């Protein structure tokens, strides 16, 4: 329809988190992609796009290579939306400090704020993370690429930004193991390490929460049932508030020690219950570590 707003996807986030890979993936998905656009040119660029019928899916990649420009990004986005001619969606790519350091060492490159090579890698990364906090808080989608392969990252993009009509709000329930690091893209993190652990039951230890024996052991414990009821009540109270605030995707992470038994079981049940009202995806971050070949 002629009066329908065009969609603008802004890709930003930590240097080294995968913006170049995402740009290529979006091109494969039919997006017109512009890389390294200074935020101060966003308004002029969008005027050109908006006056053309040749571009329907547009993405711009903006990073911190020019620090002075980056501080204008939120102002430019707000100005565009206030003028009413665009609906901007911000995709923020992140990764843990350890992963970013490893990636920089592998490529022998430096982050933008590494003080011209005189500062420590980690200092530059942490300063960049501090500067990007406001735009991260404003983002519609946050993707942690720390543990994603390029194939998994592309599939996540397809699931989120494909041409198929998407629900305005969706939930991702994720299980993880604290020993492998907390997921930095989670909105809500629940620690279930206090629940009885099947790891100490020899006949259950080799299996995961996807196995009925492990699932039943975890979920049938009285302390699990008391906790789970309160967790579900809390989420059913909170989720409408997230929707009211314009949240498009809510990521709920359930963590135990290794991400094998308890967190997987709780995540499975939670996804099952929440899917009665909302579109839900479920991810078991550590499951490939434990699936028997």
Swiss-Prot record:
Keywords: ATP-binding, GTP-binding, Nucleotide-binding. GTP binds at residues 63-66. ATP binds at residues 13-20. One of its GO terms (molecular function) is GTP binding. Belongs to the RapZ-like family. Displays ATPase and GTPase activities. This is Nucleotide-binding protein LBA0691. It comes from Lactobacillus acidophilus (strain ATCC 700396 / NCK56 / N2 / NCFM).
